[in-house]
Amino acid sequence: MARTITFDIPSQYKLVDLIGEGAYGTVCSAIHKPSGIKVAIKKIQPFSKKLFVTRTIREIKLLRYFHEHENIISILDKVRPVSIDKLNAVYLVEELMETDLQKVINNQNSGFSTLSDDHVQYFTYQILRALKSIHSAQVIHRDIKPSNLLLNSNCDLKVCDFGLARCLASSSDSRETLVGFMTEYVATRWYRAPEIMLTFQEYTTAMDIWSCGCILAEMVSGKPLFPGRDYHHQLWLILEVLGTPSFEDFNQIKSKRAKEYIANLPMRPPLPWETVWSKTDLNPDMIDLLDKMLQFNPDKRISAAEALRHPYLAMYHDPSDEPEYPPLNLDDEFWKLDNKIMRPEEEEEVPIEMLKDMLYDELMKTME
């Protein structure tokens, strides 16, 4: 028996089809009747967990901030609640995209299509163009993975799902850092940078570059590069390809347990990519960029802005059309609160009423 899904939305939208469901949200395609434009409407029911409310506020604030960026999904409209007491669900109207990179890669493996080197270049360029802008605003996305990269038939790519993103304190350093912060719910394991598992002292925008490198490799081979079953297996797979960390890189690791684990592994040289994939016809520029993205030490990893200038992306690189954004205003009450939360248990101490007020205020703001 079919389950009924209720969307309490204005009459100018006509629901068409269910697109997807997640832990606390449902997405349907719809038509904006006055214009005939197809849209996606996301229904979020975040109030079962404070964590979901903070993610929802983050998502709305950041998508507002990056509104109209060609490679970041846009919120076109929000359904304003009648009152805060009637706020039981959040409805966001977004651009409708046809698929995501995960589905495209899966289809490639099923023999339906093959990603050409041109496709791989263009998708990589668009991911990095988005990351340059995100990082310039001193934001780390923290969940870059194929299913969060939406695509249409023109091969336009848009980054979505900013619910896990974090804002960094202002700094004159170009490689922004978030000192000491980590939670158990960041980043899908296969795309997770080694510093997250090894508790380096600082977490930086380089985390997103590692994820982008994993995705570049997956587009080339059609298979996840580091499909770890658990923490130890993930680390084993990374070191199997990158080789044993240098003494300098080893000393960046702060976790005593992680250091002992790595010290007890056999010494290994890095594997050539031709060996990793059993391929000999690899684009040398792609290999060079991949090496620069997948540096074990985040300080040695290429930045998004540097990667856009790499020869592999020369066909698309246009310095006049790769925007930077000013840093977010961290005096905003939500960002001040968000940046104080260092552990999940601290999130639980925040009154749900305060978070609901912040979410309501965000929904009542006009679209700019």
Swiss-Prot record:
**What is known about its processing and modification?**
Dually phosphorylated on Thr-183 and Tyr-185 by STE7 in response to pheromone or carbon/nitrogen limitation, which activates the enzyme. Activated FUS3 down-regulates KSS1 phosphorylation.
Q: Where is the active site?
A: 143
GO biological process: what's one of them? pheromone-dependent signal transduction involved in conjugation with cellular fusion
- The leader peptide range reads none
- One Gene Ontology cellular component annotation? nucleus
Additional info? Present with 5480 molecules/cell in log phase SD medium.
Listed name of the protein: Mitogen-activated protein kinase KSS1
